[in-house]
Amino acid sequence: MSADKHEASLYQAYHAVSDGQDWTYFYCERPENKDDFHHYLQTLIHANDAVHYTAVDPQLGHALGTVGLQRIDEKNGVIEIGSVNWSPRLKRNTAGTEAIYLLLHYAFDKLGYRRCEWKCDSLNESSNSAAARFGFQYEGQFRQAIVTKGRNRDTNWYAIIDKDWPLIKQAFKGWLMAENFDSQGKQKMRLQDLRGRHS
């Protein structure tokens, strides 16, 4: 992540809608001015407990969201994909799915980790659905795990482990192939259906 390269386009992407509703389940509210947004990005860039990345539209080169690798436990080979903050445009873009695939590929194939976690607010339907779509298995709920924005949050836990990864990887690669999309950019087969074909 680079503030010099990405700050302006990220600010524009997050403010393409009039309100911060997409930030409802994020740990903070949407920064409403450029100074506050700059400070927010600096906290991500200089985080001691996570490495944050920018998701960039490969065709236009615009930064459209951020995501982090966090809770990094090198000794036990465990890592988490978290702080996923997609702009509205990225939610309708194959680049968002590709970004998650690339992080999983990095965690399992490059770093050799054994387990990759995904955690989210139990009320966050989009994040829970995304976890299932990407192939993370539901492992349970931690009730009243934290207090966020003045309320109790129950946290749902999901994970992919190393023995799951080959099948999930094959499905991601098949889904991302150009042949899986028609001339309008609509998918022909869903990611979860491709996993079913290869299982």
Task: Enumerate the predicted regions with their spans.
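Glycine-rich acyl-CoA binding loop
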Residues: 96
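Flexible ATP-lid and adjacent glycine-rich G1/G2 motifs of the Bergerat
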Residues: 103
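Conserved catalytic-core motifs of GNAT/GCN5-like acyltransferases
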Residues: 137-151
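GNAT-family acyltransferases
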Residues: 1-93, 106, 110, 151-156, ...
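Conserved active-site tyrosine of GNAT-family acetyltransferases
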Residues: 130-131, 158
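Conserved beta-strand-loop-alpha-helix junction that forms the acyl-donor binding cleft
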Residues: 118-128
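Conserved GNAT acetyl-CoA-binding A-motif
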Residues: 109-119
